[in-house]
Swiss-Prot record:
May play a role in membrane trafficking. Keywords: Calcium, Calcium/phospholipid-binding, Cell membrane, Coiled coil, Endoplasmic reticulum, Lipid transport, Lipid-binding, Membrane, Metal-binding, Phosphoprotein, Repeat, Transmembrane, Transmembrane helix, Transport. This is Tricalbin-3. The gene is TCB3. Residues 1-89, 624-660, 1304-1404 are annotated as: Disordered. It comes from Saccharomyces cerevisiae (strain ATCC 204508 / S288c) (Baker's yeast). It is found in: Cell membrane; Endoplasmic reticulum membrane.
Length: 1545
């Protein structure tokens, strides 16, 4: 059968069919609008090529006739279809047909809802109604009618209103023609249940039950009369009616009475105590039988233990001679139940008693024959035959009390999760103790010694109180106990079978050796394969396998059996030899590499086997154990700083474990509900199920016959190479006689499933229908090296922009203290970003934007809010989950994902607590979906080019065949015809055009997109370090590696959202901790251009080498399909270069008519710059330069505040002026003359240079707060920058020098970007040291321009040892020199750098100070950073072994940046040999003050005798001081003596 190709349009009757369907559904629409739509519709061709095939009549006559008839029928329908009749333009809607008229607008010139004005109907609401024209139409009539013609504007208005609604809303396919998802056209089971319930409720209950008796009576009366019976026959009819009515009435009363009784019992159950006579009767009879057995069991179990614990000192042995609890059984006095405790909880109060001495409830015979409880402890005194056993008796034991029992149900058998026990009151405990004398002469010391009984009771209550007395309770986790007894996997054993040598097969004739290895364990994990086999090697005695098999083990106290078999085609496989390995050796050495052992059969050697064993245990969750340890440490009074270090270590471990993607999944399939039964003819199913992981079947569930809601409750454990990428597929079949039919399927990743189940949802939805109840638990495993799962590049489907505006924290948190909230962003429970915390506020304003790449519509974004705690674990505030499927959807036409809403709307979401209960806390967020264009990778592009060539050849062959058929048709036209077929190349073209084909040059033209980075291999230096990758100005790492094994990096994947590719940078950081929180944690750091990395590592992997570390990386790039706004590009962030020139006509603030003006520059209420002070002038000239970091031009506000300096008291405000930076052009220089809001103006010059500001530390526990940020990339990170990055503490600062100086100067003022220079233009020593610490060494590994820094490795800081390291820093408040009018108006720049010390003669004047001389000195405590929240500085002077306290500052509270400003000064007298001792005290209001540490400064050090400030490490932070020592009263430096001439030669 052959044919030719032709292009045709769709048949015209198809459009008419859709229009007819619209008419049927939308009958309430104006007919005029429908007709106009029909006349104006354009039946354009679909754009696809249709194929007409030429069919030979002789070959297929029947098909030809059918096709011809169909074509002619379609043409006749199209020709005969008349155009719809035009309706009069006078047709309108009238008010009587409108619905919800109370929501329609009031009267207006275009028509209204009534003839009576609203002022007349509701005069109170329209006392001041605006004037308007009278109604144009009288719409008070109650039936349709034509009142007036509609104008063109009215018709156009009606058309526009109706065209606003899309076809999907007006004509939903569910109402037009619903079809079954399986394609069988059967109705939905859920809909069938609804219809059945409606029929039973309305037709049966309401109609049949109410009128059936009446209709029956009437029918039989007519029947009897028709037959000819007399009226006496009515007696029998009414008798039957009465019988039926009585039965119905009795049934109705019985059911109603039963329902009312149930409701009453449930409501009164918690108000009364139930008696348990039946239980007590059972216990009294059972106790007599069981008590002797219990007594003997206690003696048999306890006496062997007591035999070996004799204390000595004359006591030879201990033993229980007699143990009985008496003949009276314990009783339950009553049970009180609480019915409203929750869905899965039962709570009861049990009143119990064990009182054998009470005979009030016993008969006379029982009281006479009763046996009292008695415990006799025999103590043997002496040795050998000179010994005597003395009994110690405990008698008359009585216990009674009231206990609350709370049972929480679970999902796993026995369906009890936790049992909580709590004593509601101290129990009654009474007994008699006879230590001496036995039964005859024994004396009860409990009643003889006064106060002893109450003392013993108090000891008992004090011990059980913390466990059982309210509010404490003892929790027994039944699930954990059952899990501990079950044989769960504790790890994975990787068995590598390398090879075998000299294998000896059987002596059978023509036998060849075809070996394979079978691995078995003694105790296999339930649900796993008992045998694991290697491949078969044919006809070889020295096979080479090099295969690795993974075995799940539940214990290492077993043996591994390795058997080598010889494969036989017909005969049974024969055993060549076997080998047993003791796995207990892996406890000491988890790696047994390159092992060799003999395969033996009996005592004969059958060959040599080479193998390797690697043991990977499960990472234990020690959170509960560590919580108990913290509680014990707190009870023992451990130091707070130790607890804080422990908490930080636990957080690092938790963050590290969250990155592990390999592990063991424990999957329990419980049951499936609401399966589709319409495919079954009988309505009953015989379901079975199959579970697949990454396409491999791992479990087959048994078939359950004739059950529509199967319940398996079977568990399997399986090794999953990637929790996020592995595909989980569950298929449920109906096992029929003719085979299995698929009735339900569910497919997702394990990460998505676990996230869904963690949201308090017990099931997942299958397709087409079915609720699948699953339990999935995860156990992480660290598999490194060659055993780590190779990462695969997952295709993203888009990116979600998450904007967190602000939050309102309500409700009480556990603990005492201020609320310092911050939030984290998680994707499928993996933390991607942590924001900064906002100090002491319940309404934090974050204004942060987060970009999160999305790879599955089942992923869930989670926002968690915490309260930052300086000491201890952060407190949980609440969380909210945002399913990604609510943000975007899949376009059915293009197959691409698009956003649900075009506009960005702010949503108010309420937070939920740990129990998923809604709280009063609110967060305002908005989400936007950014679609992407999938691009073929270089490897895929090669395969696509091959497919294109093959497709081109297929089309040529097809066209050639069509030409031949066309020629045959011209010769024999009666034997051929044109038939329409589907495009035979459509599937191939869709496969080729699934992604875009872009070259590297075309790809890098796209500014924004998702960068996929593959780390293939690598090593870190040192081997114990971690690798972090930061992007652009994002402070939180976009990638954190798993813990390397001996410094070797695992193969991992990272996805980063890039906002501007041309300016983007990647920062590779090697740190000591999992996440570096301080500069001391950084070992080395290197920066690369993202664009250069992409160019060099796009087609082939490349090696990166920096600071002893190296790694092999590969990059891919997926661009976005929409252009990001300028506010999200690099043009929105950068540095504002400001030159503060002068001020004119400023306000006078001093008595002399002048002011001492200086300027503060604020960015979002944060001071970033402070100018010099100009004395006694209203027209100051500053000529100072400042480099101001701007994190977001669209969100930041720059304010210039002019102040008048006062020596005493607060500075006076001279006015403010704001600068709009959002409208500045990049690189253009502007001249501004800003008018102050009071008087005068300031003259500025500046320009804006876009640049990503390099991220700093302290994301959560730092001091940068209340700043608008951008957060981006796969780990959603925040742009955090300090107000200056050019200066920091010098190398002399002990630990943390890289961060502290620059951080503190930001808040104190000064130009942080300048370096002090000497008069000849070279950097001074202090500035040079600072630049060495902060600046970066330029290196070019792999021919790339990179920037690296290697901070100094500092020792651990001990606050009890005085710190003698300090360094000079740039002055925050520079020395003010007397100036006159000429100097103030000169063009000379008066900058802080000009006041910095340089290489001058004064820099070494300390040599002129006389030894043991006394000099005056002044010390100014400027500020402290990250020392404590409430800090106080104590200054002392030490000399000659004596310590003298000279000053103590006021207690200052640190601001949001962690900076406490003092500006306090004191004087002292001392010799150069003396030392200044600076101590920090943490001021506590509710507890004792805490010493944070001390620092020591030698007054003879030349560094302190130069102008400037000094930074010293104090506690966990830094202290900035200024020392003026050794100068005269005029502040002049003593002259430097001349150097002798003999030393100058």
């Amino acid at each position: 059968m052959t044919g030719i190709k032709a292009q045709v349009h769709p048949p015209p009757d198809s459009t008419l069919f859709h229009e007819e369907e619209k008419k049927k559904v939308g009958g309430n629409l104006p007919q005029k609008v429908i007709n106009q739509q029909e006349r104006g519709s354009d039946h354009a061709p679909s754009g696809h090529h249709q194929y007409h095939q030429l069919i030979n009549h002789d070959a297929n006559d029947t098909k030809t006739s059918n096709s011809v008839s169909d074509v002619s029928k379609g043409q006749k329908t199209a020709d005969s279809n008349p155009e719809g009749k035009k309706q009069s333009s006078k047709d309108i809607f009238v008010a009587s047909s409108a619905q919800k008229t109370n929501q329609l607008p009031g009267p207006n010139p275009q028509g209204s809802i009534g003839a009576v004005p609203l002022e007349g109907l509701r005069p109170k609401e329209f006392r001041s109604a605006p004037s308007r024209k009278p109604n144009k139409f009288d719409t008070s009539i109650t039936k349709p009618g034509v009142l007036d013609d509609l104008g063109k504007l009215d018709e156009k208005d009606i058309k526009e209103k109706f065209h606003l609604d899309s076809d999907d809303k007006l004509f939903p396919w569910q109402n037009v023609g619903e079809f079954h998802a399986s394609g069988k056209g059967s109705p939905n089971t859920k809909m069938s249940r609804v219809i059945k319930a409606y029929i039973l409720e309305n037709f049966y209950n309401d109609w049949y039950c109410n009128i059936a008796t009446v209709l029956g009576t009437c029918f039989f009366s007519w029947l009897f009369a028709y037959i000819g019976f007399s009226w006496w026959s009515m007696i029998f009819i009414f008798l039957g009616t009465a019988t039926v009515y009585n039965a119905e009435y009795t049934r109705f009363n019985r059911n109603i009475r039963d329902d009312l009784k149930r409701v009453t019992v449930e409501e009164t159950l918690s108000d009364r105590v139930e008696s348990t006579t039946w239980l007590n009767s059972f216990l009294s009879k059972f106790w007599v039988i069981y008590m002797p057995v219990l007594s003997q069991q206690v003696k048999d179990n306890v006496n062997p233990q007591l035999a070996g614990v004799a204390p000595g000192y004359g006591i030879d042995a201990l033993a229980i001679d007699e143990f009985t609890l008496g003949s009276k059984a314990p009783t339950i006095k009553g049970i009180k139940s609480y019915t409203k405790t929750g869905k899965n909880t039962v709570e009861m109060d049990w009143s119990f008693a064990f009182t054998p001495s009470d005979v009030s409830d016993m008969t006379a015979t029982e009281a006479r024959e009763k046996i009292n409880p008695k415990i006799s402890l025999g103590v043997t005194l002496g040795k050998s035959f000179v010994s005597k056993t003395m009994p110690i008796l405990v008698e008359d034991i009585n216990v009674a009390g009231k206990m609350r029992i709370k049972v929480e149900f679970g999902k796993a058998f026995p369906n009890i999760k936790i049992v909580s026990l709590q004593l509601l009151e101290p129990p009654l405990i009474d007994f008699a103790l006879k230590p001496i004398g036995g039964d005859t002469l024994g004396l009860d010391v409990m009643s003889f010694l006064p106060g002893l009984k109450s003392f013993v009771k108090n000891i008992i209550n004090s011990n059980i109180g913390p466990m059982l007395f309210p509010p404490n309770h003892l929790d027994i986790n039944v699930e954990d106990i059952m899990a501990a007894q079950s044989k769960e996997a504790i790890g994975v054993l990787a068995v590598t079978i390398a090879s075998a040598d000299s294998l000896k097969g059987s002596d059978f004739i023509t036998n060849t050796v075809d070996p394979y290895i079978v691995m078995t364990t003694e105790d296999a994990v339930p649900g796993t394969d008992e045998e694991v086999r290697t491949s078969i090697k044919s006809n070889v005695k020295n096979p080479r396998w090099n295969e690795t098999k993974y075995l799940l083990l539940n214990t290492l106290e077993q043996k591994l059996n390795l058997k080598c078999f010889d494969f036989n085609d017909v005969r049974k496989d024969t055993v060549i030899g076997d080998l047993q390995l003791d796995l207990a050796d892996l406890l000491q050495n988890p790696v047994l590499d390159n092992q060799t052992a003999e395969l033996r059969s009996g005592t004969k050697s059958k060959g040599i086997l080479h193998y390797s064993l690697h043991w990977f245990p499960v990472k234990e969750d020690k959170s509960e154990e560590k919580a108990v340890e913290r509680a014990e440490a707190k009870a023992k009074g451990k130091k707070e700083d130790e607890n804080e270090d422990t908490t930080e270590k636990e957080e690092d471990e938790n963050e590290e474990s969250s990155q592990t993607d390999v592990g063991i999944a424990k999957i329990t399939l419980q049951k499936v509900k609401y399966l589709d039964t319409t495919s079954s003819m009988t309505g009953s199913l015989s379901p079975c199920a199959e579970l697949f992981i990454d396409g491999q079947k791992v479990k087959s569930y048994r078939t359950l016959r004739r059950i529509n809601e199967p319940s398996w409750n079977e568990t399997i454990e399986v090794l999953v190479p990637s929790k996020s990428n592995s595909k989980f597929v569950l298929k449920i079949f109906d096992d029929r006689m003719n085979g299995k039919a698929l009735i339900c399927e569910y497919s997702s990743s394990l990460d998505d499933i676990m996230t869904t189940l963690d949201t308090a949802q017990e099931f997942v939805k299958g397709s087409p229908q079915g609720d699948i109840y699953l339990d999935v638990s995860w156990k992480s495993i660290e598999m490194t090296g060659a055993f780590a799962a190779a990462n695969s590049v997952s295709e993203p489907i888009g990116c979600i922009k998450l904007d967190v505006k602000d939050a309102i924290i309500k409700g009480d948190l556990s603990g005492v203290g201020d609320v310092d909230p911050y939030y984290t962003v998680s994707l499928n429970r993996r933390v991607l970003y942590k924001s900064i915390y906002h100090s002491d506020t319940d309404h934090p304003i974050f204004d942060n934007s987060t970009y999160v790449p999305i790879f599955s519509p089942n992923q869930i974004l989670t926002l968690e809010f915490h309260d930052y705690q300086k000491i201890g674990k952060d407190r949980f505030i609440g969380s909210v989950q945002i399913p990604t499927s609510n943000v975007f959807k899949k376009d059915p036409k293009s197959g691409k994902y698009v956003g649900n809403n075009g506009k960005e709307e702010i949503s108010k979401l309420k937070l939920k607590d740990h129990e998923h209960k809604v709280t009063e806390s609110i967060v305002n967020v908005s989400t936007t979906f950014i679609p992407i264009n999938l691009v073929y990778s270089p490897e895929e592009l090669v395969n696509v080019e091959k497919l294109e060539k093959e497709l081109k050849e297929k089309k040529k062959k097809f066209e050639a065949t069509q030409e031949e058929n066309e020629q045959e048709m011209e010769k024999n036209p009666k034997e051929w015809e044109v038939a329409e077929i589907e495009d035979p190349f459509d599937s191939d073209e869709k496969k080729i055009n699934r992604k875009a084909k872009l070259s590297l040059n075309e790809l890098i033209k796209q500014k924004s997109g998702i960068l996929s980075m593959q780390i293939l291999e690598g090593t870190l230096s040192p081997s114990s370090a971690y690798l972090e990758i930061l992007a652009d100005d994002i402070s939180y790492p976009v990638f954190i590696c798993m813990k390397p094994s001996q410094g070797k990096l695992n193969s991992e994947m990272a996805n980063i959202f890039i906002r501007d590719l041309n300016y983007s940078k990647l920062h590779f950081r090697v740190s000591k901790k999992h996440i570096a929180k301080d500069s001391d944690d950084v070992i080395s750091e290197t920066s690369y251009s993202t664009l250069k990395l992409l160019k060099q590592a796009y087609e082939e992997p490349m090696w990166l080498n920096f600071n002893g570390s190296k790694m092999k990386v590969r990059f891919l790039y997926t661009p976005t399909s929409v252009k990001l706004p300028s506010s999200e590009s690099v043009e929105d962030t950068g540095y504002l270069n400001i030159k503060l020139i002068s001020g004119h006509g400023l306000k006078s603030a001093d008595r002399n008519g002048y002011s001492d003006p200086f300027v503060h520059i604020f960015v979002n209420d944060k001071k970033v710059f402070k100018s010099n002070i100009k004395k006694k002038t209203l027209d100051p000239v500053w000529n100072e330069d400042a480099k101001i970091p701007i994190l977001s031009r669209s969100k930041n506000q720059v304010i210039f505040n002019v102040l008048d300096w006062d020596r005493a008291g607060d500075n006076d405000d001279l006015g403010q002026a704001s600068l709009d930076v959002s409208s500045l052009e990049v690189g253009k220089t502007y001249n501004w003359n800003l008018n102050l809001n009071t008087q005068g103006s300031i003259k500025l010059q500046g320009s804006f240079n876009p640049e990503y500001i390099k991220p700093s530390f302290d994301i959560v526990k730092g001091g940068i707060t209340d700043k608008p940020m951008k957060i981006a990339s796969g780990a959603a990170h925040a742009t955090v920058g300090i107000a200056g990055t050019g200066i920091g503490a010098a190398t002399g600062v002990a630990t943390g020098g890289l961060k502290k100086g620059g951080h503190l100067l930001k808040s104190l003022g000064g130009n942080p970007m300048k370096r002090s220079k000497s008069s000849n233009g070279n950097e001074s020593n202090g500035a040079k040291k600072s630049s060495e610490k902060k600046s970066f060494d330029r290196r070019s590994p792999s021919n790339l321009n990179s920037t690296s820094v290697t901070p100094r490795a500092s020792l651990d800081y001990d606050p009890s040892v005085p710190n003698t390291s300090y360094a000079p820093v740039q002055s925050a408040s520079p020395v003010v020199k007397p100036t006159d009018n000429t100097s103030s108006s000169s063009n000379k720049k008066d900058t802080p750098s000009s006041n910095s010390r340089g290489h001058s003669r004064a820099s070494s004047f300390a040599r002129t100070l006389a030894p043991h001389g006394t000099y005056n000195g002044f010390i100014t405590v400027v500020a402290a950073e990250n020392v404590a929240k409430h800090v106080q500085i104590k200054i002392s002077l030490t000399q000659g072994g004596r310590l003298k306290h000279i000053y103590k500052t006021k207690s200052q509270k640190a601001n949001n940046d962690g900076v406490a400003v003092f500006d306090e000064e004191c004087s002292f007298k001392a010799s150069p040999e003396a030392n200044l001792v600076l101590g920090a005290i943490s001021h506590q209001r509710l507890s004792r003050d805490k010493d944070l540490g001390i620092a020591q400064i030698n007054l003879g050090d030349p560094q302190i005798q130069q102008d400037g400030q000094i930074s010293v490490k104090l506690g966990d932070g830094h202290l900035i001081v200024k020392i003026n020592y050794g100068k005269d009263k005029n502040g002049q430096v003593p002259p430097v003596p001349e150097v002798p001439q003999e030393y100058t030669q």
